[in-house]
């Protein structure tokens, strides 16, 4: 029989850099999970992606054990890297802060494909382009 789920915790943690300090410690500590065990497992699983912030979904069971699933980095972070900017525009409709090409958008779609809710590559590209527009990043040919 399957274990009974106690809680599901969603966090965004830099790959390979989980430690018991906030936000990881308090989020897991309140559910009675062994925080150091999670940090060691997460860091070992995400060493190859160092430098990226990864969303992680942690499933905590009644017996205080856990499993976790890492997702692809958020589209906004990938777009900021592609456009070489520190942050998005405060007024995206008026002020453009950077540019990305369609080819860069296509690369981001390849990275994010498993986490996107799109049936075609074109639809996924439109989703990423929409995120770029909302950040004040111009999409050029």
Curated annotation (Swiss-Prot):
Entry keyword set: Methylation, Ribonucleoprotein, Ribosomal protein, RNA-binding, rRNA-binding
Ranges that cross the membrane: none
PROSITE patterns xref list: RIBOSOMAL_L11
Biological process according to GO: translation
Gene Ontology CC terms: cytosolic large ribosomal subunit
Annotated SMART domains: RL11
Pfam families per record: Ribosomal_L11, Ribosomal_L11_N
Subunit structure: Part of the ribosomal stalk of the 50S ribosomal subunit. Interacts with L10 and the large rRNA to form the base of the stalk. L10 forms an elongated spine to which L12 dimers bind in a sequential fashion forming a multimeric L10(L12)X complex.
Role: Forms part of the ribosomal stalk which helps the ribosome interact with GTP-bound translation factors.
Family membership: Belongs to the universal ribosomal protein uL11 family.
Protein name per the record: Large ribosomal subunit protein uL11
Naturally occurring in which organism (per UniProt): Methylacidiphilum infernorum (isolate V4) (Methylokorus infernorum (strain V4))
